Amino acid sequence: MIRLLIPIVSVVLMLVSCRAKTVDGMPIELKEQLIGLSGAHNARQLGGYRVGDKKIKSGLLLRTATLSGLSREDSILLCEKYNVQCIYDFRGKDESLSAPDVIPGKARYQSMALSFTGDGKRADTKFGSQAQMIEALLQHADHPSVQAMCTRLYEIIFFDKSSQQVYREFFTDLMTLNPENGAVLWHCAQGKDRAGCASAMLLAALGANRELIMADFALSKSYYDPIASRIKTDTDAQKNVINTLISANPELFGKALDKIDAEYGSMLNYLTECIGVTPEMMNILRERYLE
């Protein structure tokens, strides 16, 4: 069995030497975005990012990997520091059952099961855990369907009709929440693909440019590269699986954004036409989460 995740403290120590990316002259550093959870990987916030002449309020918009390993101290932190009021879980049902979230305090849990099938139908992985899924994908890395996932992953997430419906539900529910009542947290298995696309959409709705959206996505690569480098691969096809499904692939993500621009003109048009996020909704989100 592949061991997907090395201890979080080890990952954090490896990140000390990561070079900061710069957006509009401002450094975007992973260590500045991390929220200090010991039992959840890639746990960070959108707070502090500059959006035009404003910035995203700190401590209100959190993105993480699965919460199944939260410690007691993590739960206390999420309750007392962030007052998390709602958790959105983008994992499939089998994934969620295999590794149920630890729900901090009285936070509301909302399943947002998202398909990777690309066929317009909701589906759940039958692998159970993320580790089992990756092991199976490595064993069949040369299969055309696996390679298609590695080359079209973000395109599938953004353009699959059932995925769009899930994100529509996410934004619809998000609009009902008052940030004065606490933070919202969304996650998938590793907090980089399904959750990463949610973050990209939310950043765009808040007025972020493509450069910031790409920089935020790339922080997942900075986080997971030390883990991916420890997994042995024997073929180029397996390396492709690791680089995309264990780490993150900004180049592939950028191609999906290119397709959005080509087909819809902009991410904002995509949000309105495909996700149902109207300009009025965007204005409300900006009033709530920018300062």
PLM region descriptions:
Residues 1-4:
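Positively charged n-region of N-terminal signal peptides that target proteins for export
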Residues 6-14:
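Bacterial N-terminal signal peptides
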Residues 18-185, 197-291:
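Cys-dependent protein tyrosine phosphatase-like superfamily
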Residues 190, 194-195:
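Ser/Thr-glycine-rich phosphate-binding loops at phosphate-binding pockets of nucleotides
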